[in-house]
Amino acid sequence: MDKERKLIIAGNWKMNKTVAEALDLVRGLKLELASVKEVDIVVCPPFTALSEVSKAILDSNIRLGAQNMSENNVGAFTGEIAAVMLKEFSVRYVILGHSERRQYQKESDALILKKALAVHAASLKPIVCVGETLSEREGGQMETVLQTQITGSLAGLTKDQMEETIV
């Protein structure tokens, strides 16, 4: 029997907010959203703010997410971050396959699948993004592009992993 999923609202702050600005924002969110129970609330600040935001939301209904993660656990991967590192900040969710990373960093569905498997191996929850470009939409390719991304990004996941994956 399929279990009913709780709705989730996730905010990706992208490359916005200094640590001080992130703390101001999350303190305001804590006050405004304190009574919200029917949805899971996730904030995904820049990596530089993860530590402080993690501390600021400890006693709240807000959960922490990361904007990306390496498929590797350790090694000479300059500028990357591993799941074990994210867990030190109490990160619970990781955004994967965002359109900007697909476009500018040329991330493939195969790479996103590897990242999703690494996220699951760390007992975190992946938020796998899919989406077509404007030219693909205007060219009538939306459904094909989305199907290809979904299939390619999730093809190696188990049923249990799929149930923990947000698309």
Regions found by a protein language model. Give the residues of each.
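Active-site loop-to-helix "anion-binding N-cap" substructures in soluble metabolic enzymes
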Residues: 1-167
